[in-house]
Design a protein with these regions (language model features):
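Single conserved hydrophobic/aromatic residue that forms the stacking wall/gate
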Residues: 246-255
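N-terminal amphipathic alpha-helix/helix-capping segment at the start of soluble metabolic enzymes
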Residues: 1-10
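Catalytic alpha/beta core domains of metabolic enzymes, predominantly
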Residues: 129-224
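Glycine-rich, proline-tolerant flexible connector loops at the mouths of alpha/beta enzymes
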Residues: 14-19, 44-61, 229-236
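Hydrophobic faces of well-ordered beta-strands that scaffold small-molecule active sites
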Residues: 10-12, 41-45, 81-83, 101-103, ...
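Catalytic beta/alpha-barrel core
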Residues: 79-87, 100-110, 123-134, 153-157
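N-terminal active-site wall of soluble small-molecule enzyme domains
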Residues: 45-102, 109-113
Length: 255
């Protein structure tokens, strides 16, 4: 069960599917820690990163091959799966494999996309855009509810602070909790430094523990964390990824 008063849930995995072997390895690392630290676990991976800085950037295996890999992972480990969609037509096939459909932050105002995702009846994870206030996300919630879907999660991922930087307003957690929806904290992407690596996004992954502690202290439902066996070699958002050594996260609120 996912909720602000329930046991912490981690949406954990990789930024994008690089290979079947890699995501299976990452899933096993999270499963091991979820058992030891007693948090609920949902595996996250993208089949396509449509929003990349450069045309040369790696995007992923695509819808068909990506869903096949996610389906195999789900069957092997009996895990709930989260992935994101970028176009309305992707909602139906994704809903046949995944338990949670994520709306990317940059696409959260795309009404057709949001509505098609909501029509599947799946849990919808709404990533609050970097350019949007906490209260504005409530309009997106209404779009989902307009087609009868009240299974909605709100996810904080920082706000634009000048050029090439993001900051997290800690008050956003309490504002979003006013909706009574489960609130998550995307620690990984809140540490982005967009455009700082010329053709890709930089980041400050070394501060993941500090931000994770701050988020947990707000009594939220869970954290969103992406990892990689070697972040320096990750094909997308490596500078923001959590190293395996940092997967041992605090799971009780800090006072």
């Amino acid at each position: 069960k996912i909720g602000n008063s329930e046991r912490l849930t981690i949406f954990g995995g990789v930024n994008v599917i690089e290979s079947k072997e890699l995501i299976f390895e990452v899933a096993e690392a999270f499963i091991k820690n979820s058992s030891k630290l007693k948090f609920n676990f949902v595996f996250k991976a993208s089949f396509d990163k449509a929003n990349r800085s450069s045309l040369d950037s790696y995007r992923g295996p695509g819808l068909e091959d990506g869903l096949k890999i996610l389906s195999e992972l789900k069957q092997k480990y009996n895990l709930p799966i989260l992935t994101d969609i970028h176009e309305p037509h992707q909602a139906k096939p994704v809903s046949e494999v995944c338990d949670i459909i994520q709306i990317p932050a940059f696409l959260c105002r795309q009404t057709d996309l949001v509505v098609e995702a909501a029509k599947t009846g799946k849990i919808i994870n709404l990533k609050k855009p970097q350019f949007m206030s906490a209260k504005e996300i409530f309009h997106v919630v209404k779009k989902c509810e307009s087609v009868g879907n009240k299974n909605i999660i709100l996810c904080e991922r920082g706000n634009i602070f000048g050029y090439n930087n993001l900051v997290v307003d800690i008050l956003n957690f309490q504002i979003m909790k006013e909706s009574t929806k489960p609130v998550f904290f995307d620690v990984t992407h809140s540490l982005q430094q967009p455009g700082t690596l010329e053709k890709s996004t930089g980041g400050r992954g070394e501060y993941v523990l500090e931000l994770a502690k701050a988020g947990i202290s707000q009594g939220i439902a869970g954290l969103f964390l992406e990892t990689h066996p070697d972040p320096s070699k990750a094909l997308c958002d490596g500078p923001c990824a959590v190293s395996y050594t940092h997967l041992t996260l605090p799971t009780t609120p800090y006072v």
